[in-house]
Amino acid sequence: MSRPASSTPPGRPQPRRGALTPTLIVVALVVVGFIFFANVWTDVLWYQQLGFFEVFLTENLARIIIFLAGFALMFVAMFYAIRIAYHARPVYAPDSEIRDNLNRYQAQLEPVRRVVMIGLPVLFGLFAGSAAASQWQKVLLFLNQEPFGQNDPQFNLDISFYLMTLPFLGFVTGFLISVVVVAGIAGILTHYLYGSIRIMERGIFTSRAAQIHLAVTGAVFLLLLGVNFWLDRYSSVQNSNGRWAGALYTDVNAVIPTKSILAVAAALVAILFIVAAVIGKWRLPVIGTAMLVITSILAGGVYPWVIQQFQVRPSEQTLERQFIERNISMTRAAYGLDKIQEKRYNATTNATTGALAPDAQTTANIRLLDPNLISDAFSQLEQYRPYYQFPSALNVDRYEVDGKVQDTVIAVRELNPDGLSANQQSWLNRHVVYTHGYGVVAAKGNKFTADGKPEFLQAGIPSTGVLGNDSTYQPRIYFGENSPEYSIVGAPEGSPHREQDRPAGKEGDGETQYTFTGNGGPNVGSFFNKVLYAIKFQSSDLLLSDGVNAESQILYDRNPRDRVEKVAPYLTVDGNAYPAVVDGRVKWIVDGYTTSQYYPYSQQEQLSAATADSQTTAGRTVALPNSSVNYIRNSVKATVDAYDGSVTLYAWDDQDPVLKAWQNVFPTSLKPYSEMSGALMSHVRYPEDLFKVQRELLGRYHVTQPDNFYTNNDAWSVPNDPTVKEEVKQPPFYMSLQMPDQDKPAFQLTSSFIPQVVNGTARNVLYGFLAADSDAGNQKGVKAESYGQLRLLQIPPEAQVPGPGQAQNKFNSDPTVSQALNLLRQGASAVLNGNLLTLPVGGGLLYVQPVYLRSTGETSYPTLQRVLVAFGDKIGFAPTLDEALNQLFGGQSGAKAGDFANNGQTPPPAAGGSTPPATGGTDAKAELKAALDEANAAIRAGQEALAKGDFAAYGEQQKKLSAALQKAIDAEAKLGSEGASPTPGATTAPTATPSAAATPSPSPSN
């Protein structure tokens, strides 16, 4: 038969059909490799520019070395297991059927045998190396560990053994066991494939070489298993599976001795395997292995179960007492609760005249602005341009104003690229022109204007106020919580400005331009760097645009928390970074924690669950990761400059052994806190997430007597936030207050406790009040002695002090309050409950809640209209806090609130919350009708003004509305006096459940 004619012309070479696939593979590998290189090299540039290249180099060298060690161990063990088994193969298989089957398998494998013998160890080595490299922190902590100077109560070993040595030994042992198991399986399969192990009718045949190989492998495995059993003895004090953490009675008297026996038994059986390899008889190691398995089941499982069920359970409280004591003391030490100051607080519920006189300074500082509701007011009054924004939750800090410390609600005006109009949405605008925000905006926490707006301390464009101006501090915000992914800044000297800086003025249409002059990011002027960053951010514009010049810098990774996490990978970063004006710069202050889950006898806590509250649920604060810890320290205070992004880490808890170990690893990355300026010291706060973890633990661990702890009769819970619909915990609150044992007020972080919530129900009465001193002083490098001091007020149950839920219910169900709030709701306005603050003043507990009104419309914002207060069973309700307190405390509280200057802006209530006797029901009804008509007219006029954007007219109508409401309240009180209805001030609140219409609405964001 003739061969088909070729389609290729004579003389032309035949094409190589197989060349395309390898070429594509090579090209793909080159592309992937260059992308990987681009990401690595840009990281190098980022760390070098920031001054933390040591961190990048140390971490990645550690990862590489550990990866190579893990890869080498797995590769060598697996390769030689396969190689030894292959070279030990018999020349002929005695059984013809088996020989035929093996020949068939071997024939299929032979063409790729060398590839498989090397490829499989390489593949498993890559997996093993990657797994090992992820444990780099354990390795470095072990190599650089520092002693705690404290020993555990069971083995009397330094705590550092459990936090830094035992995790490393556990990792190494577990890794080696995995290597031996994988290598052993590979050896067995190879022996079987080449006939050294054969399954026959008479049993399993094993060649002499295979016996020796398997015996040695088994001996090594058993020796490692014995080491693992021995280490398990120490791990028992880290046990968190029981009712209490640590080694309990059964662990100490059954599990630990059993682990010792099993460790010795495993070593003996390993010796039997070696003997079997020498003499060729397997009876003893087989019997030994069987006995080891039986012993591990009986002694490791059955025996401890018998002890627990028949010895411990009948007398659990007695037998576990000393171990509960260990759990209590070690948990309190691990979480920094061992130095808490506890005080019995015999709180009164009687609101007597002048009761607040001893707490005059605290009363004057009570915060009325809710940082979670006032953001829209900041936006409407201070945003100026659509491309600016404020965060949904503002921050609470303090500044010295006129010689006095003033609680302040503060935020920075950040850039919002999404606010650009459609015709502005170009790459050049988003990354070269609009690059930064501008200015700090701050308002007094305890005051507001007569029409309910914030009273600003710092505001405007240009930025002016008590915190400084453009000439005294740098107002530009290049690094913030909502900054763009990246921006290109900088230009040669003398070049025209390209960056949009700020509006020329509030009313003017002009804009000013600016050129970044700091050192904020890697240089991106060279062609090579342009290519790298174009690949990193997948943008050809970055490579081709004329907006990138020889002096250009690229700013990225701009979130303060992200920057701290990158330069300090060993820290867990607090969910709330906050800005402060410090030494002429805007600094983001970030708290960092060193944590561990290996502290002996300490209770485990899930960070995400312990720190969850209404703030994290609503997304206002970043939630912490879902990781377990049983040791935590606020070891680092970090600052991130909002202008150039520079990061400074201060060793705040310089006595923390974990931090000391990391300082040994990264010796140049942290500065001592003695280098912190006085201005920075004055803005340091006690961190929220640490406080939330501590209060969660205190719910149980305020009890230190083991018998009471065992019964759990005095356990507490953090109350739910009564201002939101969801059943989530109330967040802690920053405020300036004076605790009963303090000489003067201090900036503190506070929370309260109610009886333990069981099956979703609890008595909502106060059992405890916790405050953490957040005042670090204002001296350079000197930490105030009182900073971080936890103070716990324990309230006796018989005091019957209402909890936050009860206080909110009293507000909602009071008929006078309901009437006024229903009037405020007319005209489609929403009534918003502000944060419900709890303060230990007047010999009892005072509740304060601002009430905001928000009308409909895109340009509306909340204005503070009323203040609710409660003390015991009485409540007050007035346009100002000062007036409400006077209502509550018999006409005169004894102290002035911060908003006392606003008194009289609306008709005040009668002294003591009472009204003169009505002269006639007809007159009172007429007054009430007239007041309601005035209120309705003011609401309608306000809505019309708001629709026109006339905020001045809207403010005037709000004043008229407030005055009309007060007239209505007075008129209703006159009518009520004739029918014995409650008066509007200082009334005993009914406990009836309010109607839906009479209940103040929670914040819409919740």
UniProtKB/Swiss-Prot annotation:
Disulfide bonds: none annotated. InterPro entries: UPF0182. The chain crosses the membrane at residues 18-38, 64-84, 115-135, 168-188, 211-231, 260-280, 287-307. Pfam families: UPF0182. Its main location: membrane. The keyword Mitochondrion does not apply. The keyword Metal-binding does not apply. Residues 495-509 have a biased composition (Basic and acidic residues). It is a multi-pass membrane protein. Residues 911-923, 979-1000 have a biased composition (Low complexity). It is found in: Cell membrane. Keywords: Cell membrane, Membrane, Transmembrane, Transmembrane helix. GO terms for cellular component: extracellular region; plasma membrane. Residues 490-519, 896-923, 975-1006 are annotated as: Disordered. PANTHER family: UPF0182 PROTEIN SLL1060 (PTHR39344:SF1). HAMAP family: UPF0182. Belongs to the UPF0182 family. NCBIfam families: PRK00068.1. This is UPF0182 protein Arth_2749.
